[in-house]
């Protein structure tokens, strides 16, 4: 028996359930998000549903359903079984250098395949797509080339707008609402390569444990969800970082500090970035071996990624490997090789 698509009339009942404070089952939430992402809900219904969820508070089941639906509708690519994504929700309004993007390059240079998923900046000065474009990556590269880059170089960039065309049905309502909704959490949960390992940053600590559970439900083998004590959606070097790890079906929470990786504390102003061109220049300098607080935070995040991927026993070991990948020129070479495959066409 075929499943009938959820219609605009059907979603009314689901909106009413949420509006009265009732949590949706994963099946009911899937029906709602299937309607929304298929264009079978009106803008008013989408806005009403998203705000009802926001006011009541989104549940693990609802976030899982939304992310799974987004994954199902994505333009998929293949990545090696051990691939990791290093990604943040954005929304921390910190205006830092591009940390996860640089950490992804360093992690790949250490031999761990990275299926990097990201977008242009929403609340910051420079998103991962912005800085990579400034470095010479072609955001519109054929998806087969992105797949090839991951396979041959160990890293490729999946530009979210290329992979999630279903978001066109949600964009008008999100724009008119002008406030955070469940969709601000979904990007890092909807990796088009289905990476089974993930280092994910989030803009608020309240989401650290729930999103680790969501990643587990979505099939992650091991994942860290992190939030810096300074508000960063990254592992920070200005103080402690709260971590929820999903592994072996269990979520475990703990805090880490730069000292765990043998790194010094930084000041927030030392991590301030600028526009994509300036951030690209800083990233190039980092790959050349220039030692700054930016390098330290990138090494720390890469160290964590290596731990998550099973390529380092602990943060100190991971940090040493990450630093060596930079100092040997391997990380710089990784960027050059990626650009050789998915670089912007000559003008």
Swiss-Prot record:
SUPFAM superfamilies reported in the protein's UniProt record: Nucleoside phosphorylase/phosphoribosyltransferase catalytic domain (SSF52418), Nucleoside phosphorylase/phosphoribosyltransferase N-terminal domain (SSF47648)
Q: List GO terms (cellular component aspect).
A: cytosol
User: What positions does the entry give for anthranilate 1 binding?
Assistant: 88, 119
Question: What broad class of enzyme is this?
Answer: transferase
Query: What keywords are annotated for this sequence in UniProt?
Result: Amino-acid biosynthesis, Aromatic amino acid biosynthesis, Glycosyltransferase, Magnesium, Metal-binding, Transferase, Tryptophan biosynthesis
Function description: Catalyzes the transfer of the phosphoribosyl group of 5-phosphorylribose-1-pyrophosphate (PRPP) to anthranilate to yield N-(5'-phosphoribosyl)-anthranilate (PRA).
The UniProt annotation places Mg(2+) 1 binding at 100, 234
Cofactor details (free text): Binds 2 magnesium ions per monomer.
Q: List the disulfide bonds.
A: none
Source organism of this protein record: Rhodospirillum rubrum (strain ATCC 11170 / ATH 1.1.1 / DSM 467 / LMG 4362 / NCIMB 8255 / S1)
Under catalytic activity, the entry for this protein gives:
N-(5-phospho-beta-D-ribosyl)anthranilate + diphosphate = 5-phospho-alpha-D-ribose 1-diphosphate + anthranilate
Name the positions where anthranilate 2 binds: 174
The record's section on Gene3D superfamilies has: Nucleoside phosphorylase/phosphoribosyltransferase catalytic domain, Transferase, Pyrimidine Nucleoside Phosphorylase, Chain C
- Pathway of this protein? Amino-acid biosynthesis; L-tryptophan biosynthesis; L-tryptophan from chorismate: step 2/5
Q: What is this protein called?
A: Anthranilate phosphoribosyltransferase
- Record GO biological process: L-tryptophan biosynthetic process
Q: Which NCBIfam families match?
A: trpD
EC number(s) on record?
Answer: 2.4.2.18
Q: How does it assemble?
A: Homodimer.
**Which family, according to UniProt?**
Belongs to the anthranilate phosphoribosyltransferase family.
Task: Show the GO MF annotations.
Answer: anthranilate phosphoribosyltransferase activity; magnesium ion binding
The entry's 5-phospho-alpha-D-ribose 1-diphosphate-binding residues are 88, 91-92, 96, 98-101, 116-124, 128
* Cofactor(s) annotated in UniProt: Mg(2+)
């Amino acid at each position: 028996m075929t499943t009938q698509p959820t219609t605009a009339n059907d979603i009314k009942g689901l909106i009413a359930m949420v509006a009265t404070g009732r949590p949706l089952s994963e099946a009911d939430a899937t029906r709602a998000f299937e309607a929304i992402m298929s264009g079978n809900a009106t803008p008013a219904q989408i806005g009403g549903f998203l705000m009802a969820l926001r006011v009541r508070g989104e549940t693990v089941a609802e976030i899982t359903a939304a992310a799974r639906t987004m994954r199902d509708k994505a333009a998929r690519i293949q990545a090696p079984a051990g691939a990791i994504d290093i990604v943040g929700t954005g929304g921390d309004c910190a205006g830092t250098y591009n940390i996860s993007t640089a950490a992804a390059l360093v992690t790949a240079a250490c031999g761990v395949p990275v299926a990097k998923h990201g977008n242009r900046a929403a609340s910051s000065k420079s998103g991962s797509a912005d800085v990579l474009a400034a470095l010479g990556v072609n955001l519109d590269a054929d998806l087969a080339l992105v797949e090839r880059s991951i396979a041959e170089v160990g890293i490729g960039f999946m530009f979210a707008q290329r992979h999630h065309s279903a978001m066109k049905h949600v964009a008008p309502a999100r724009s008119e609402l002008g406030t955070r909704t469940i969709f601000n959490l979904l990007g890092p949960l909807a990796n088009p390569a289905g990476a089974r390992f993930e280092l994910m940053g989030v803009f608020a600590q309240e989401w650290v444990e729930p999103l680790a559970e969501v990643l587990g439900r979505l099939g992650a083998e091991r994942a860290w969800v992190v939030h810096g004590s300074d508000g960063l959606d990254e592992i920070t070097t200005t103080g402690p970082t709260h971590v929820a790890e999903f592994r072996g079906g269990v979520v475990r929470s703990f805090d880490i500090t730069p000292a765990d990786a043998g790194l010094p504390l930084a000041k927030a102003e030392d991590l301030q970035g600028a526009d994509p061109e300036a951030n690209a220049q800083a990233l190039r300098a980092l790959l050349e071996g220039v030692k700054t607080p930016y390098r330290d935070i990138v090494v720390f995040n890469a160290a964590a990624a290596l731990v998550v991927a099973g390529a380092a026993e602990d943060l100190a070991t991971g940090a040493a490997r990450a630093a060596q990948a930079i100092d040997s020129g391997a990380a710089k070479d990784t960027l050059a090789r990626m650009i050789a495959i998915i670089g912007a066409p000559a003008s």
